[in-house]
UniProtKB/Swiss-Prot annotation:
<feature type="domain" description="Ig-like C2-type 1">
    <location>
        <begin position="31"/>
        <end position="127"/>
    </location>
</feature>
<keyword id="KW-0524">Neurogenesis</keyword>
<feature type="disulfide bond">
    <location>
        <begin position="339"/>
        <end position="395"/>
    </location>
</feature>
<feature type="compositionally biased region" description="Pro residues">
    <location>
        <begin position="1315"/>
        <end position="1325"/>
    </location>
</feature>
<dbReference type="GO" id="GO:0007156">
    <property type="term" value="P:homophilic cell adhesion via plasma membrane adhesion molecules"/>
</dbReference>
<dbReference type="GO" id="GO:0016199">
    <property type="term" value="P:axon midline choice point recognition"/>
</dbReference>
<keyword id="KW-0677">Repeat</keyword>
<feature type="glycosylation site" description="N-linked (GlcNAc...) asparagine">
    <location>
        <position position="756"/>
    </location>
</feature>
<dbReference type="GO" id="GO:0001657">
    <property type="term" value="P:ureteric bud development"/>
</dbReference>
<dbReference type="GO" id="GO:0003272">
    <property type="term" value="P:endocardial cushion formation"/>
</dbReference>
<feature type="disulfide bond">
    <location>
        <begin position="154"/>
        <end position="203"/>
    </location>
</feature>
<dbReference type="InterPro" id="IPR036179">
    <property type="entry name" value="Ig-like_dom_sf"/>
</dbReference>
<feature type="topological domain" description="Extracellular">
    <location>
        <begin position="22"/>
        <end position="863"/>
    </location>
</feature>
<comment type="subunit">
    <text>Interacts with SLIT2.</text>
</comment>
<feature type="domain" description="Ig-like C2-type 5">
    <location>
        <begin position="422"/>
        <end position="508"/>
    </location>
</feature>
<dbReference type="InterPro" id="IPR013098">
    <property type="entry name" value="Ig_I-set"/>
</dbReference>
<keyword id="KW-0145">Chemotaxis</keyword>
Length: 1470
């Protein structure tokens, strides 16, 4: 850019800036305060804000000043409690204020500044609010009268701002809007106070700091006395009574007093009642005047006056105010006869006894020997009444105007008869209590003599039977641990010789009641009323009056009146309830009857004690209406009548005839009253019942409806209307007894003792009293069983109410019955109580009304019945299981024998042109089974001779061996098998000391027969049992060959025993091994078979005739049918858990369950039958020379038996379903042998015959190579043993008592001489020579392990080719077969020489196991008796098994056989 242009641009910009700056400054203006701060009063410690807002341009800054000094804010000091807000306001976090330091209180201004100037706000003061605690003046209590004003003063505490005042009454704020209430300057003024204004008043001072309450002050509002009833002026006659009433009210209750003419009343002239009524009994002229009633309390006083005027009346004759009345008093008592009179002038009163001249005057001094006195009011009192005092007493009143008199009779009675029955002072009350609580039922009684307290429940005695119920002091009943059954009505009975009194209450026991009885305080109850006074008497009523007693917590609300009359009842009776007044007339009484009365008061807390008894009072009598007779005369004549009662006569148990005579028949007799009462029994009573004989001339009466067996007291009394004469003497009579008409009640049956007890307890209550019909003397108890021999009877005394019956039989149903017995006989029996003592001796009580169905149900529920049914079901189930097992075993035994029949032309009947197979569907052979069960080979731990080689049939029994005893061989086979024996590898070869047993290896059954032409099909034998024995002393050797020597390896602790068997040839079986036909030639030699195994050494003491039963033609199935049948690979056995013994059905040493099936090539060669016959004749000829010797230094342990139904046998579905065949091209794929797996729990013998070539043989012991496997190999580590994980088999126990331990280390085993010979080899070819060479090589197996291993690998492919080439040979001549057999025998002899070398005894230390290979189950289309068919996975083993059926190979043959495993299951690598 040009420098000139740049300079110009700079100048231009500078000018623009100057111009713009001048314009901005022109718009600025100085600050001005927009919002000024306001005065504020704030409490100490509270936050507040002084607002200040200013505007200006530029924006002004704001500062605050207090009292002229700048205020320090958080801008200056971050710790300051003052904050300058962005708006300019000053914010105080808290107001700081103290007595000495007041930094925040003062006058504040806000100053806003900018460059143009400053602005100052108005002053704002900040004051700190205060309120002290102490009131300057607290209100004081005030007492006012209602209607007067009340003033309460208060001065609040000091504070800033000055606190205001309001008032609270009873903690509620007073509304001063009410007209009567005003608050002025701290004064509360209430005009015209009311009673409702009374209460506690509090003065409250408040400001912004808070509130302060003064001390409370009480305002008491009293009421002045007021008159409810004022006295009134009265005018009365002289001698009349006068009353002035004065009723007042007030608060507090005013006191009332009377004055007369401003002076006190004269004493003795007036009475003042409780209601302040003034009463003057007899007014006199001197009583005239003004009477003033004065009522006064603390807030007032009132007066009311009335005037009394007394007028003198004229002279009046005397009159009775209160007349004396008749009285009946017992001897020794005191009696008073009232007599009140009036008249003008006042009459003089005196008393006189009728017939006596003595006069008794009021205020007369009492004579020393006199018991009579007269009160000033005219009442006569006689103390210590005697019988001589009886009679009439006359009260006379005498004046100048005349005289009057009144009579009253005094009757004196016997002391005992006069005494009233006992009085219950406090009786029980109704209660509701909880279960397990305690009940207290009070009953306090008094009387003369002192009564006895007893208790009844529902009318029956119960004390003594239940220890929970006891009577405490003063008769209180206590019941502990209450139960629901304790609910009922309880009656307290107070009894004495004078009678009895009862009181009842209800006790209700519930789950939710009170725990214990409530004890009432006697002070809460009202006091007893005063003694009732008789004010009026009529013929059927008496008027009583009394005074209330001392009130309790609450005054009495009502009264109860009780009465007693000896002629009516023997106990107190309630005659009036809920009486509200103290004056009451009792009505409904009998005429001319003496009564006693007493009164009780009631309030909500209960009943009071009774009042004192009233004086006896007799109701008025009734005069005959028309006769107008003199009562005195009637009473006198009746008193002279003497009635003589004769002895009553019992007519029936309920009727008695009463007769009497009268000495003189008086004029005034209307009839005779026969009186009787019960004196015995539970309900004995003192109440007399009456039967009136209304004909005066009648002298007899019949009492009916009497109780049976009860004693009655009878007397007769004459009567005339209401007048009654003297009673006759009493007579007693007892009605006749009868048997009780009702059974005992509440019969219960309980168990006694422990659960093993056979005793029961029976308890009961007596029959109802009305049905006892006499005195119960005893109770009879029957315990009746279902048979007479189980009956148990008992008899107990009448006082006993329970009994224990023992010796009952469990399971027997008893019926318990109880009956009461009197002298007349046994009464009604109770309802039977069925009981059963169960298995645990439990007593089962069934209701009598149960139906038969319910009773059956109860029996079915018994444990004994259930246990019996369960046991029976178990026995039936076990029987059925045994039968089913036997039947199944029998059917399997019949179905497992694969037998062929020889044709007439010497040929073989076959199924579908297949050699060795029968047509299962042929109707000519219905006994053949539909399917072949699973193969389970016998497992044994002993050695047996060759004479028992044929006993592998399912039902054949092994013949006994010398020294063996009763030991039976293990037989677990469910299918047919082949057998091959390897003798050259056994240590007992050429030895006559032991006998070997052949080992089965294939699936076609070899039948035991005594004749070459005999077909032996034996049923299963029960002695064919499992005897699996394992030895721990052989380095964990898993499986062994069958052993029949009882003592062999039978020791404990790993010790071995040798059993010496007789060297003499066994003669048990007449058939010889030479007679056993060989199977048809296999396609491929079996690995591990040597031709030398068939070399016979008869010179060593073996008798060939005792060997194995010959068969006409051996049934045999060829292998190599991969292209015809396919294996069902969905059925795969689960690999076993290591350390668990594998199934001998598959894993038995030198055995194989691989199915041998014919190949299509064999079916196409009809010459095979001829070859088979020729080979059989040659084989039998050569085998006759063999001698079997068994030596076994280390017999291997016996493996556990397999689970029943293992997959080695054919399933039914397998035999009924055809599966398409699968191509077997991968059979020829090379195998790689992996490195061995060490330290396995079990390494049983291989499925191959020669254990030297198996994983337990010598061939792999040094090189530690892993043996190949097949899905259907008997190798326990690859297929069969792994199945034990599904069904582990428990450890077997030897007969010696030792448990078989599970082997824990790998082991190996030599080939044993009891191995069965394999089938003959097919026609010779390249493969045959090669295999014989391998056989020769096996003699040096221990010194050339590496070379053997490599030989096996080299020969795999060659063996496959050899197998194919052997299948391509359609026909062989007889000479070729014979030459092959001769080579085979020579090789066997060479093998035996090699075995005798010292190194033959060497045994490797460990063994290997290949990983688990998925096996394949046989195709359903298979026809093998073992239940399997050929597949890819079983080709190798099946070919090896075929070689066993043709000839034995040398041990080296195994190493060079190319195919020993299944390529379809995986490759093996080294």
């Amino acid at each position: 850019m040009n420098p000139l242009m740049f300079t110009l641009l700079l100048l231009f910009g500078f000018l623009c800036i100057q111009i713009d700056g001048s314009r901005l400054r022109q718009e600025d203006f100085p600050p001005r305060i927009v919002e000024h701060p306001s005065d504020v009063i704030v409490s100490k410690g509270e936050p507040t804000t002084l607002n200040c807002k200013a505007e200006g341009r530029p924006t002004p800054t704001i500062e605050w000043y207090k009292d002229g000094e700048r205020v320090e804010t958080d801008k200056d000091d971050p710790r300051s409690h003052r904050m300058l807000l962005p708006s300019g306001s000053l914010f105080f976090l808290r107001i700081v204020h103290g007595r000495r330091s007041k930094p925040d209180e003062g006058s504040y201004v806000c100053v806003a500044r900018n460059y143009l100037g400053e602005a100052v706000s108005r002053n704002a003061s900040l004051e700190v609010a205060l309120l002290r605690d102490d009131f300057r003046q607290n209100p004081t209590d005030v007492v006012v009268a209602a209607g007067e004003p009340a003033i309460l003063e208060c001065q609040p505490p000091r504070g800033h701002p000055e606190p205001t005042i309001y008032w609270k009454k009873d903690k509620v704020r007073i509304d001063d809007k009410e007209e009567r209430i005003s608050i002025r300057g701290g004064k509360l003024m209430i005009s015209n106070t009311r009673k409702s204004d009374a209460g506690m008043y509090t003065c409250v001072g408040t400001n912004m700091v808070g509130e302060r309450d003064s001390d409370p002050a009480e305002l008491t509002v009293f009421e002045r006395p007021t008159f409810l009833r004022r006295p009134i002026n009265q005018v009365v006659l002289e001698e009349e009574a006068v009353e002035f009433r004065c009723q007042v009210q007030g608060d507090p209750q005013p006191t009332v007093r009377w004055k007369k003419d401003d002076a006190d009343l004269p004493r003795g002239r007036y009475d003042i009642k409780d209601d302040y009524t003034l009463r003057i009994k007899k007014a006199m002229s001197t009583d005239e005047g003004t009477y003033v009633c004065i009522a006064e309390n603390r807030v007032g006083k009132v007066e009311a006056s009335a005037t009394l005027t007394v007028r003198v009346r004229p002279v009046a004759p005397p009159q009775f105010v209160v007349r004396p009345r008749d009285q009946i008093v017992a001897q020794g008592r005191t009696v008073t006869f009232p007599c009140e009179t009036k008249g003008n002038p006042q009459p003089a009163v005196f008393w006189q006894k009728e017939g006596s001249q003595n006069l008794l005057f009021p205020n007369q001094p009492q004579q020393p020997n006199s018991r009579c006195s007269v009160s000033p009011t005219g009442d006569l009192t006689i103390t210590n009444i005697q019988r001589s005092d009886a009679g009439y007493y006359i009260c006379q009143a005498l004046t100048v105007a005349g005289s009057i008199l009144a009579k009253a009779q005094l009757e004196v009675t016997d002391v005992l008869t006069d005494r009233p029955p006992p009085i219950i002072l406090q009786g029980p009350i109704n209660q509701t209590l909880a279960v397990d609580g305690t009940a207290l039922l009070k009953c306090k009684a008094t009387g003369e003599p002192l009564p006895v307290i007893s208790w009844l429940k529902e009318g029956f005695t119960f004390l003594g039977r239940d220890p929970r119920a006891t009577i405490q002091d003063q008769g209180t009943l206590q019941i502990k641990n209450l139960r629901i059954s304790d609910t009922g009505t309880y009656t307290c009975v107070a009894t004495s010789s004078s009678g009895e009194t009862s009181w009842s209450a209800v006790l209700d026991v519930t789950e939710s009641g009170a725990t214990i009885s409530k004890n009432y305080d006697m002070n809460d109850l009202p006091g007893p009323p005063s003694k009732p006074q008789v004010t009026d008497v009529s013929k059927n009523s008496v008027t009583l009056s009394w005074q209330p007693g001392t009130p309790g917590v609450l005054p009495a609300s009502a009264y109860i009146i009780e009465a007693f009359s000896q002629s009516v009842s023997n106990s107190w009776q309630t005659v009036a309830n809920h009486v509200k007044t103290t004056l009451y007339t009792v009505r409904g009484l009998r005429p001319n009857t003496i009564y006693l009365f007493m009164v009780r008061a009631i309030n909500p807390q209960g009943l009071s004690d009774p009042s004192p008894m009233s004086d006896p009072v007799r109701t008025q009598d009734i005069s005959p209406p028309a006769q107008g007779v003199d009562h005195r005369q009637v009473q006198k004549e009746l008193g002279d009548v003497v009635v003589r009662l004769h002895n009553p006569v019992v007519l029936t148990p309920t009727t008695v005839q009463v007769t009497w005579t009268v000495d003189r028949q008086p004029q005034f007799i209307q009839g005779y009253r026969v009186m009787y009462r019960q004196t015995s029994g539970l309900q004995a009573s003192t109440v007399w019942q009456n039967l009136d004989a209304k004909v005066p001339t009648e002298r007899s009466a019949v009492l009916v409806n009497l109780k049976k067996g009860v004693t009655y007291e009878i007397k007769v009394r004459p009567y005339f209307n209401e007048f009654q004469g003297m009673d006759s003497e009493s007579k007693t009579v007892r009605t006749t007894e009868e048997a009780p008409s009702a059974p005992p009640q509440s019969v219960t049956v309980l168990t006694v003792g422990s659960h093993n007890s056979t005793s029961i307890s029976v308890s009961w209550d007596p029959p109802p009293a009305d049905h006892q019909n006499g005195i119960i003397q005893e109770y009879k108890i029957w315990c009746l069983g279902n048979e007479t021999r189980f009956h148990i009877n008992k008899t107990v005394d009448a006082a006993i109410r329970s009994v224990v019956i023992g010796g009952l039989f469990p399971g027997i149903q008893y019926r318990v019955e109880v009956a009461a017995s009197t002298s007349a006989g046994v009464g009604v029996k109770s309802e039977p109580q069925p009981i059963i003592i169960g298995g645990r001796n439990e007593v089962v009580i069934t209701e009598n009304n149960n139906s038969i169905t319910e009773q059956i149900t109860d029996v079915v529920k018994q444990p004994a019945f259930i246990a019996g049914i369960g046991g029976a079901c178990w026995v039936i189930l076990m029987g059925f299981s045994i039968w089913l097992y036997w039947r199944r075993k029998k059917r399997k035994g019949l179905s497992n024998y694969a037998v062929t029949f020889q044709r007439g032309d010497g040929g073989l009947m076959s199924n579908g042109s297949r050699p060795g197979l029968l047509n299962a569907g042929d109707p000519n052979y219905p006994w053949l089974a539909d399917s072949w069960p699973a193969t389970s080979l016998p497992v044994n731990n002993s050695n047996s001779g060759p004479n028992e080689i044929g006993n592998f049939g399912r039902g054949d029994v092994l013949p006994p061996v010398p020294g063996q005893g009763d030991k039976t061989a293990t037989m677990l086979s469910d299918g047919a098998i082949y057998s091959s024996i390897d003798f050259t590898t056994k240590t007992t070869y050429n030895s006559s000391s032991q006998i070997t047993q052949a080992t089965p290896y294939a699936t076609t059954q070899i039948l035991h027969s005594n004749s070459i032409h005999e077909l032996a099909v034996d049923l299963p034998d029960p002695q064919w049992k499992s005897s699996v024995q394992q030895k721990t002393d052989l380095m964990g050797f898993g499986y062994s060959l069958p052993d029949q020597n009882k003592g062999n390896n039978g020791g404990k602790g790993g010790k071995k025993k040798k059993t010496k068997n007789s060297s003499k040839a066994q003669k048990n079986n007449g058939s010889t091994w030479a007679n056993v036909p060989l199977p048809p030639p296999p396609v491929q030699p079996l690995p591990g078979t040597e031709l030398g195994h068939y070399a016979a050494e008869q010179e060593n003491g073996y008798d060939s005739d005792s060997w194995c039963p010959p068969l006409p033609v051996q049934t045999y199935l060829h292998q190599g049918m991969e292209d015809e049948l396919e294996e069902d690979e969905d059925r795969v056995p689960t690999p076993p858990v290591r350390g668990v013994a594998s199934s001998p059905a598959i894993s038995f040493g030198q055995q194989s369950t691989a199915t041998l099936t014919p190949s299509p090539r064999e079916e196409m060669q009809p010459m095979l039958q001829a070859h088979l016959d020729e080979l059989t004749r040659a084989y039998q000829f050569d085998i006759a020379k063999q001698t079997w010797h068994i030596q076994s230094n280390t017999p291997p342990p016996q493996p556990p038996a397999p689970p029943l139904g293992y997959v080695s046998g054919a399933l039914i579905s397998d035999l009924e379903t055809d599966v398409p065949d699968e191509d077997a091209d991968d059979e020829e794929e090379p195998l790689e042998i992996p490195r061995p797996l060490r330290a396995l729990d079990q390494t049983p013998g291989s499925s191959m015959d020669n254990l030297d070539s198996s994983v337990t043989g010598k061939a792999f012991s040094s090189s530690q190579r892993q043996r190949p496997t097949s899905p259907f190999s008997t190798d326990s580590n690859t297929s069969a043993a792994q199945n034990q994980s599904q069904r582990p088999r428990p450890t077997k126990k030897h007969k010696g008592g030792r448990m078989d331990p599970q082997p824990v280390l790998p082991h190996r085993r030599e080939g044993m001489p009891d191995d069965l010979p394999p089938p003959p080899d097919p026609p010779p070819g390249q493969g045959l020579r090669q295999q014989i060479g391998l056989s020769q090589h096996s003699g040096n197996v221990e010194n050339s392990t590496e070379r053997k291993g490599s030989s096996l690998e080299r020969q795999q492919a060659a063996n496959l080719e050899d197998t194919k080439s052997s299948l391509d040979c359609p026909a062989k001549t007889v000479l070729e077969w014979q030459r092959q057999t001769q080579d085979w025998i020579n090789s066997t002899e060479r093998q035996e020489e090699t075995r005798k070398a010292p190194h033959k005894q060497g045994v490797g230390s460990e063994e290997s196991l290949v990983p688990y290979s998925k096996p394949s189950f046989p195709s359903p289309g298979g026809h093998s008796s073992s239940g399997t068919s050929s597949s890819k996975g079983s080709t190798g083993p099946r070919k090896a098994d075929v070689l066993r059926g043709s000839h034995q190979r040398n041990a080296n043959d195994l190493l060079d056989i190319g195919y020993v495993g299944s390529n379809s299951q995986g490759q093996f690598t080294e």
